[in-house]
Amino acid sequence: MMLPLQGAQMLQMLEKSLRKSLPASLKVYGTVFHINHGNPFNLKAVVDKWPDFNTVVVCPQEQDMTDDLDHYTNTYQIYSKDPQNCQEFLGSPELINWKQHLQIQSSQPSLNEAIQNLAAIKSFKVKQTQRILYMAAETAKELTPFLLKSKILSPNGGKPKAINQEMFKLSSMDVTHAHLVNKFWHFGGNERSQRFIERCIQTFPTCCLLGPEGTPVCWDLMDQTGEMRMAGTLPEYRLHGLVTYVIYSHAQKLGKLGFPVYSHVDYSNEAMQKMSYTLQHVPIPRSWNQWNCVPL
C-alpha cells in the first residue's frame, strides 16, 4: 500500500512522529520540516500506512521528475522504522522510478541491504557514499538532548575567529554566483548540478563573504532537506578561517528562523572536521548516506 499524505494536519503529525526517531530520521525530518514551512521545493511525503507507518519516502512530484538523467532532482529521502522489511515498499514501481538516474538519501546506514537487494532485482548499479553527519549544538539541545550528555560545551565556545571586516563583507549569494559553487562542489561540476544550485540559491537562505572585488570568496548554501551544503572557498582565500566564519554566520541565521541546523563532512576532510569541532557541532558517525542509482 502507498499513501501520499495530504493536508497540513497529516504532515504536522508526521513531523512530530519523525522527531521522536531522531537522529535516525534526521534527513527526512529536515525535509518534512520544510514541507511544513511553505514546501518551497514542491515535495510530497508517502507512507506505507497511516498513522502507524513503518516507512516514509519524501520525493518531488512526478511532473517535476521528467529528466531521467537528473539525479539531483530525482532524489528520495527515506526513513524506515523497519529497514530490514522496507524492501517490498521501496520496490513498488509507483513509488520510485528505478528506470531513472536517481539518488536516495538517509540517516540510516541500515537501509543499505534493502537498496543493494533492489539493485539486483531491478538491475541498476548503486554507489553508496557515507559521511559524518553534524548537528549544531543548539539544534541538538532542542531535538536530541541525549546526544549532548557526554559532551562538555563551553558556554562561550563555538565562535569563529574575527575576520578583517574592511576586506570581507558578509552577504547572501545571488543566482549569478551558482557557477562558482558548481565549480568547487564535490558532487557538482555539470549542467544539472548548476540548475540544482540555482534553485537552492533562489529558494533558501544562503551566506557568503564578498571579497575586495565584491564577489563571493567563501559561501554556504542549504538544500531541500534543510541541510547546510556546498560550502566552498576560493583557493587563494583558504586557510584564513573564512569558511568557519561563514558556516557559523549561516547557522546563526538558520537558527533564528527556527530551522534545524545540520551538515555533513567527508571522513577524509580533516580541516572541516576540525572546524565542526571548533563550532561545537555534534558528530553522528555514518549517519549521512547517499546511494546513487543508475539503471544498467
UniProtKB/Swiss-Prot annotation:
<feature type="modified residue" description="N6-acetyllysine; alternate">
    <location>
        <position position="141"/>
    </location>
</feature>
<dbReference type="GO" id="GO:0005739">
    <property type="term" value="C:mitochondrion"/>
</dbReference>
<comment type="function">
    <text>Mitochondrial acyltransferase which transfers an acyl group to the N-terminus of glycine and glutamine, although much less efficiently. Can conjugate numerous substrates to form a variety of N-acylglycines, with a preference for benzoyl-CoA over phenylacetyl-CoA as acyl donors. Thereby detoxify xenobiotics, such as benzoic acid or salicylic acid, and endogenous organic acids, such as isovaleric acid.</text>
</comment>
<feature type="modified residue" description="N6-succinyllysine; alternate">
    <location>
        <position position="256"/>
    </location>
</feature>
<dbReference type="InterPro" id="IPR016181">
    <property type="entry name" value="Acyl_CoA_acyltransferase"/>
</dbReference>
<dbReference type="GO" id="GO:0006544">
    <property type="term" value="P:glycine metabolic process"/>
</dbReference>
<dbReference type="Pfam" id="PF08444">
    <property type="entry name" value="Gly_acyl_tr_C"/>
</dbReference>
<keyword id="KW-0808">Transferase</keyword>
<feature type="modified residue" description="N6-acetyllysine; alternate">
    <location>
        <position position="16"/>
    </location>
</feature>
<dbReference type="GO" id="GO:0006637">
    <property type="term" value="P:acyl-CoA metabolic process"/>
</dbReference>
<dbReference type="InterPro" id="IPR010313">
    <property type="entry name" value="Glycine_N-acyltransferase"/>
</dbReference>
<dbReference type="Pfam" id="PF06021">
    <property type="entry name" value="Gly_acyl_tr_N"/>
</dbReference>
<feature type="modified residue" description="N6-succinyllysine; alternate">
    <location>
        <position position="141"/>
    </location>
</feature>
<dbReference type="GO" id="GO:0047962">
    <property type="term" value="F:glycine N-benzoyltransferase activity"/>
</dbReference>
<dbReference type="GO" id="GO:0005759">
    <property type="term" value="C:mitochondrial matrix"/>
</dbReference>
<keyword id="KW-0216">Detoxification</keyword>
<dbReference type="GO" id="GO:0032787">
    <property type="term" value="P:monocarboxylic acid metabolic process"/>
</dbReference>
<dbReference type="GO" id="GO:0009636">
    <property type="term" value="P:response to toxic substance"/>
</dbReference>
<dbReference type="GO" id="GO:1901787">
    <property type="term" value="P:benzoyl-CoA metabolic process"/>
</dbReference>
<dbReference type="GO" id="GO:0006805">
    <property type="term" value="P:xenobiotic metabolic process"/>
</dbReference>
<dbReference type="InterPro" id="IPR015938">
    <property type="entry name" value="Glycine_N-acyltransferase_N"/>
</dbReference>
<keyword id="KW-0007">Acetylation</keyword>
<dbReference type="InterPro" id="IPR013652">
    <property type="entry name" value="Glycine_N-acyltransferase_C"/>
</dbReference>
<feature type="modified residue" description="N6-succinyllysine; alternate">
    <location>
        <position position="183"/>
    </location>
</feature>
<feature type="modified residue" description="N6-succinyllysine; alternate">
    <location>
        <position position="127"/>
    </location>
</feature>
<keyword id="KW-0496">Mitochondrion</keyword>
<protein>
    <recommendedName>
        <fullName>Glycine N-acyltransferase</fullName>
        <ecNumber>2.3.1.13</ecNumber>
        <ecNumber>2.3.1.71</ecNumber>
    </recommendedName>
</protein>
<feature type="modified residue" description="N6-succinyllysine">
    <location>
        <position position="169"/>
    </location>
</feature>
<feature type="modified residue" description="N6-acetyllysine; alternate">
    <location>
        <position position="256"/>
    </location>
</feature>
<keyword id="KW-0012">Acyltransferase</keyword>
<feature type="modified residue" description="N6-acetyllysine; alternate">
    <location>
        <position position="183"/>
    </location>
</feature>
<feature type="modified residue" description="N6-acetyllysine">
    <location>
        <position position="159"/>
    </location>
</feature>
<dbReference type="GO" id="GO:0016746">
    <property type="term" value="F:acyltransferase activity"/>
</dbReference>
<comment type="similarity">
    <text>Belongs to the glycine N-acyltransferase family.</text>
</comment>
<feature type="modified residue" description="N6-succinyllysine; alternate">
    <location>
        <position position="16"/>
    </location>
</feature>
<feature type="modified residue" description="N6-acetyllysine; alternate">
    <location>
        <position position="127"/>
    </location>
</feature>
<dbReference type="GO" id="GO:0047961">
    <property type="term" value="F:glycine N-acyltransferase activity"/>
</dbReference>
